[in-house]
Every structure is written in C-alpha cells, then in structure tokens.
Amino acid sequence: MSDVAERVKKIVVEHLGVEEAKVTENASFIDDLGADSLDTVELVMAFEEEFSVEIPDDAAEKILTVKDAIDFITANS
C-alpha cells in the first residue's frame, strides 16, 4: 500500500472514529463509514493540510470513497 493510501486511511480513522479495518479503498465516506456532509468537508480540509494540495469544490464533490481521495491526491501532488 502506498504512503498516500496509508496517510489517507489514518486521517479517515482519526476524523470519523471508525475502525481501521473498515477503511478500505472502496469504502464510501457516507454510506460505509457513516460520515455526514460536514464530516466530508472536514476530511477534504484535512487532506489539503496533510498533503499540501488544494482540492477545488467541484473536485471535492466527486471524492466519495477512500480510493477517490487517494487517486486525487496522487494525481495532484
């Protein structure tokens, strides 16, 4: 697993308070991990801070799963 993937998963575990085992690449932040809209905004902000990357609103709306976050960060950092 890549460094980016590990760091994304760590942020998700910390922000959503879910078990690490539940944070799979295909896990949906809302449907599988119980996030609400505020949680998703906070996750995006945490990703921006951790990876020093800007995630525009239109891109943030498309980041629905752990893999979406990993792919965006990998492509833009």
Swiss-Prot record:
InterPro entries: ACP, ACP-like_sf, PP-bd_ACP, Ppantetheine_attach_site. Pathway: Lipid metabolism; fatty acid biosynthesis. GO terms for molecular function: acyl binding; acyl carrier activity. It holds the Pfam family PP-binding. GO terms for cellular component: cytosol; membrane. 4'-phosphopantetheine is transferred from CoA to a specific serine of apo-ACP by AcpS. This modification is essential for activity because fatty acids are bound in thioester linkage to the sulfhydryl of the prosthetic group. The modification O-(pantetheine 4'-phosphoryl)serine is found at residue 37. The keyword Transport does not apply. The keyword Transcription does not apply. GO terms for biological process: lipid A biosynthetic process. It is found in: Cytoplasm. Residues 2-77 form the Carrier domain. Keywords: Cytoplasm, Fatty acid biosynthesis, Fatty acid metabolism, Lipid biosynthesis, Lipid metabolism, Phosphopantetheine, Phosphoprotein. Belongs to the acyl carrier protein (ACP) family. Carrier of the growing fatty acid chain in fatty acid biosynthesis. This is Acyl carrier protein. It comes from Paramagnetospirillum magneticum (strain ATCC 700264 / AMB-1).
